[in-house]
Amino acid sequence: MPESRMPPRKLHIKSYGCQMNVYDAQRMADTLAVEGYVETTSAEDADLVILNTCHIREKASEKVYSELGRLRAAKDQAARDGRGMNIVVAGCVAQAEGEEIIRRAPMVDVVVGPQSYHHLPQLLARAKTCGRALETEFPVADKFGFLPQPSRQAIRSRGISAFVTVQEGCDKFCTFCVVPYTRGAEASRPVAKVVEDVRRLADNGVREITLIGQNVNAYHGEGPDGRPWPFGKLLYRLAGIPGIVRLRYSTSHPRDVEDTLIDAHRDLDALMPFVHLPVQSGSDRILAAMNRRHTADDYRRVIDRFRQARPDIAFSSDFIVGFPGETEEDFAATLALVGQIGYAAAYSFKYSPRPGTPAADMQETVSTADMDQRLVQLQNLIDSQQSAFNRTALGRTIDVLFDRAGRKPGQIVGRTAYLQPAHVEASDAIIGQVLPVTVASLERYSLFGTLASKPTSGEPSNHAATGGAQFQTTAGA
């Protein structure tokens, strides 16, 4: 008789927050693929559901508990159907609230922090034996040394853009931020390991790499010479890997912008002229209260250094309004800084106190009404700058890396150097190619145009055109 085979078990991962979580979700899927799990888009049909969580803002945490309430019903239904469902809470909420999650959501089987994903198979086995498993320590061993490499099929299914973690953790201890407590101290991967990952991705059709870390430009991984390499030197090394046509990185800290990074933007065509450089506030008084350890003028000087090296460079940033003690004068300084820099995009949020951070104990709170008013005012200014920046593309011919099929039949979508979505009518054979597009119109934040030259023959993409890495802020900088 032929040997019977167990059907594959179904895995559903829902990620919240930054692109580090997107990368972590992929590595968890790779780890569990070895155990016979295949991904599904339906949580209700899954044998294993993982919530990969974010702890940056209060609402993000509460969303997790709301989702767990929904999953409890799905788990009960699975039991009535005669099958099991395991629920895992991973990520930064797991790290920060481990025991509290078990108390509030007893249907959870495993709680695992972001440094222990490689232990998922063992934790699931422990939960089966003991009822549940929790692991939120910061292990001494490097988790990356234990995570399996993604299969060729997995790489190709994820698109022509990919994230690669090169640095994790944060030593800055901004007073509003939980990242040092949930991700641990700054640690950098060795140059050789990063190069190995990028080569493997390039060999399987990836064309664009986004290097990620909580403070990515604090990178100091060991080079082949046995010495720590600065981030800029790593970029020079990766730019020489065949097949990689675009390099990006996020998130940066103004204090860690060193000369080799500036030089890389001057010298490397593959390094995109778009930098996410969070500043959080334009007020020196508030920056000091945040423990940012730089002034608004320090930030302006960093921007000037980038622009001198690469005149076509553009910037995005993060801002917090309503930080404890923020006055109208402090907020006016933020508006002034935004007006002086001129951003292509930015992310702005109302201050959200996080338990365990120094700012959560500060007494000079700002009213909700004032925070709401300031957020609207700041976002209106940022939106006007982004619209003005996008209008500069009208009538111009710009390079676009095409990465997926559009929503409309016959439409292909790519991204410019500045991450603007660009839509053209074309065959999906152009996916994976960088082609010039003449921009004819704008719609909200997207560009629409026509190909200015014929696609390269014989270079169709082998990817399922499901989209690749997209820009979000990585918490920590």
Curated annotation (Swiss-Prot):
Classification via Gene3D superfamilies: Methylthiotransferase, N-terminal domain (3.40.50.12160), tm_1862 like domain (3.80.30.20)
Family the entry assigns: Belongs to the methylthiotransferase family. MiaB subfamily.
Entry's EC annotation: 2.8.4.3
Protein name: tRNA-2-methylthio-N(6)-dimethylallyladenosine synthase
A Gene Ontology molecular function term of the record: N6-isopentenyladenosine methylthiotransferase activity
Major location (coarse): cytoplasm
Gene name of this polypeptide: miaB
MTTase N-terminal domain segment(s): 9-129
Note accompanying the cofactor annotation: Binds 2 [4Fe-4S] clusters. One cluster is coordinated with 3 cysteines and an exchangeable S-adenosyl-L-methionine.
Record-linked PROSITE patterns: MTTASE_N, MTTASE_RADICAL, RADICAL_SAM, TRAM
Source species of the chain: Nitrobacter winogradskyi (strain ATCC 25391 / DSM 10237 / CIP 104748 / NCIMB 11846 / Nb-255)
GO cellular component: cytosol
Highest taxon, organism lineage: Bacteria
UniProt-listed InterPro entries: Elp3/MiaA/NifB-like_rSAM, Methylthiotransferase, Methylthiotransferase_CS, Methylthiotransferase_N, Methylthiotransferase_N_sf, MiaB_methiolase, rSAM, rSAM_horseshoe
Composition-biased stretches (Low complexity): 464-477
Metal-binding recorded as keyword: yes
